[in-house]
Amino acid sequence: MEASVHIGNSVPHAHLHSAAPARPADPVRPDGSRRALRIGLGGPVGSGKTATVAALCRALRDRLSIAVVTNDIYTREDADFLLRHAILPAERILAVETGACPHTAIRDDISANLEAVEQLEATVGPLDLILVESGGDNLTATFSKGLVDAQIFVIDVAGGDDIPRKGGPGITTADLLVINKTDLAPHVGSDLQAMAADAKRQRGERPVAFTSLTADNGVGPVADWVGARLTAWTAA
């Protein structure tokens, strides 16, 4: 059992965590209605996860009821960024301080994140979508199916155009791979066509989205994918 700290808005409290459930989370609320779709966003430090979360919220918040859970090891920096830029009202953003390797809190011991998700459902709901952002991690980071229903993995061209070729569970198994900061490709010498080809070899038919969040509607391909997942989720 591992102790860590969970921040709900700004009130910290300690938890003793148990192992993550192996089976997918129940899609139905206690009242029989379908709960919010939960999508996890993972990726290396600096790849643009928080910026992607912010852009998704801006693109979708006028038509969907959204909440966010962020993960940081010792701070609530990502949550503070979202609050500072008025991405969502404060009550729709919860921060988890993992106190350990970021992947532990999203895959091996999800209890703090699961509590945050369930707290949002209970206090802010009904919600359509909850985004769970992992702390920055390496290419092996994946989410437990007991926490999220789908996973987005974010990399960026500044990390090198060989990243898709290197693979790793984040690259190969995520439901959507996002290759971010395409506007920087000419400046860092990254070959977008090579990245696309390598991603295709690693992922087969799983989708890949190229994004530049500095462009108008730069998050559009990701927002469209989320919208399609939500349509399928609510129709199930």
Curated annotation (Swiss-Prot):
Domain of life: Bacteria
Region (Disordered): 1-40
Any one GO biological process: urea catabolic process
Residues where GTP binds: 43-50
Subcellular location: Cytoplasm
GO molecular function, a single term: nickel cation binding
InterPro entries membership: CobW/HypB/UreG_nucleotide-bd, P-loop_NTPase, UreG
Record HAMAP family: UreG
Assembly and interaction partners: Homodimer. UreD, UreF and UreG form a complex that acts as a GTP-hydrolysis-dependent molecular chaperone, activating the urease apoprotein by helping to assemble the nickel containing metallocenter of UreC. The UreE protein probably delivers the nickel.
Protein name listed in UniProt: Urease accessory protein UreG 2
